[in-house]
Design a protein with these regions (language model features):
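Extracytoplasmic low-complexity, Pro/Thr/Ser/Ala/Gly-rich segments
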Residues: 52-126, 369, 379-392
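Conserved PDZ fold ligand-binding element
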Residues: 182-212, 216, 323, 330-343
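PDZ/PDZ-like groove recognition
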Residues: 155-195, 385-391
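PDZ-domain C-terminal substructure recognizer with occasional recognition of PDZ-binding tails
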Residues: 214-256, 354-373, 377-380, 389
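Second-shell loop/turn segments in exported
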Residues: 96, 129-141, 168-172, 184-186, ...
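C-terminal, low-ordered peptide segments at domain boundaries
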Residues: 232-285, 385-392
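Glycine- and Gly-Pro-enriched alpha-helical subdomains that act as flexible
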Residues: 289-291, 301, 309-341
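Hydrophobic membrane-insertion alpha-helices, especially the h-region
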Residues: 37-55
Length: 392
């Protein structure tokens, strides 16, 4: 069969073309009416498509390069001598859009700076409301860890205090049976507690560490409840949380962090930015405020990575988008988390390689695993040395 030329849409069949004209050469009323109908129909289609692209939401989130905050001017140390720096320690953030519409998804596909991620991968199977609460809590916990890590690095004693902070509430516990079937058990705390609730006590007992609550939970039979005394929004209340049995143990389904009595008042203003990835940057900014000299050497230093109270640096997401922000801010050094030796190492190394490509050869990309390593990077880049507990 011979190839056929593709058909090209045209005006309606009842519209004469070329248009008939009267003796004067002007279009007839029939011709004008036909064209008006065609234009209206085409306009309606355009409007419907535009509205559909705006209204219809898809299960994807997008991550685009955001900007930076100079933490040197956003960390304030009270009641002790401080030493403002001349350079900049840059917190990097990305712009996340959740549950985007079709037009936003198309725009993201055409922009190499924007990353597209399935929404359930971002939320971890939780609701968007919970994910938003968790992100705000992550920033609060990140600030707490930054204070502790920085002060310990400088030789301060930072003791723990009673109570435990809720830092995660997984909705389910998953495991494989002997025959390979995946089972999911719903965890009750997910619907009863909130991220960043403080657990003051359980069954009338005070709590100092995670093991204290675990011991109390294991003393209960499945189906009975633990009475958790919690503090939320400045008010205390008791919440009855059922205990569930999972292979080998019993749970209520809560991840916890210890609380600390910080000996120095340190205020940190990160505006409305949420998430855990600013931990290392905040830690370095606190250290720079509390030590003479300039930790940055007068340069713009971009930093990303989580921090724990012991100074360990953890991996983060959207590294490539943060690299774009670091380059735009004129950073000379970009400190990033080193890759752990686990199943995600290959993907992590790929992300670091992409970040190096984004910032170009003029920016040093320095992977670190600990706070001490980050301080070493800054010393080698011309920053003032810090007399710390790890370097003593």
């Amino acid at each position: 069969m011979a190839d056929q030329e593709p058909s090209v849409p045209g005006p309606p069949a009842d519209l004469e073309w070329p248009p008939e004209s009267g003796d004067s050469g002007a279009p007839t009323s029939r011709t004008i009416a036909g064209w008006v109908k065609w234009v209206i129909a085409a306009g309606v289609v355009v409007v419907v498509v535009a509205l559909a692209g705006t209204i219809i939401r898809v299960p994807y989130d997008t991550f685009a390069p955001g900007g930076t905050l100079n933490l040197e001017s956003r960390v304030a140390v009270k009641d002790v001598k401080s030493y403002p720096g001349r350079g900049a320690l840059l917190l990097l953030f990305v712009r996340e859009r959740t549950h985007v519409n079709l037009w936003s998804l198309l725009q993201a596909k055409l922009d190499s700076d924007i990353d597209i991620v399935k929404q359930d991968k971002v939320t971890g199977g939780t609701s968007q409301r919970y994910a938003d609460q968790q992100a705000v809590c992550d920033m609060t916990q990140s600030q707490n860890s930054a204070r502790v890590a920085a002060l310990r690095e400088l030789g301060y004693k930072v003791p723990t205090s009673p109570g435990l902070d809720v830092i995660g509430l997984p909705p389910t516990y998953s495991y494989k049976t002997a025959d390979g079937v995946v089972k999911n058990i719903k965890l009750p705390a997910y619907n009863l507690l909130r991220p960043c609730d403080e657990i003051v006590g359980a069954d009338g007992h005070t709590l100092e560490q995670n093991a204290d609550l675990s011991k109390i939970v294991k003393s209960h039979k499945p189906g009975t409840s633990v009475a958790l005394r919690i503090a939320r929004d400045g008010q205390e209340q008791t919440v009855e949380v059922p205990v569930v049995a999972v292979p080998g143990t019993r749970l209520v389904g809560v991840s916890l962090a210890r609380r600390y009595k910080v000996p120095v008042r340190i205020d940190i203003d990160t505006s409305d930015i949420s998430g855990p990835s600013a931990g290392l940057a905040m830690t370095l900014a606190i250290i720079d405020q509390l030590t003479p000299g300039d930790l940055t050497g007068g340069k713009n230093i971009a930093v990303t990575g989580t921090i724990d109270p012991n100074g360990n640096v953890g991996e983060i997401g959207a590294l490539e988008q943060k690299a774009v922000a670091a380059r735009a801010a004129g950073a000379k050094v970009f400190i990033v988390p080193a890759c752990a030796k686990d199943s995600g190492r290959a993907a992590c190394l790929k992300d670091i390689a992409a970040a190096k490509k984004r910032v170009g050869g003029d920016v040093l990309v320095a992977p670190v695993s600990t706070l001490a390593q980050a301080l070493q990077v800054l010393r080698e880049a011309g920053g003032a040395p810090v007399r710390s507990s790890s370097s003593a």
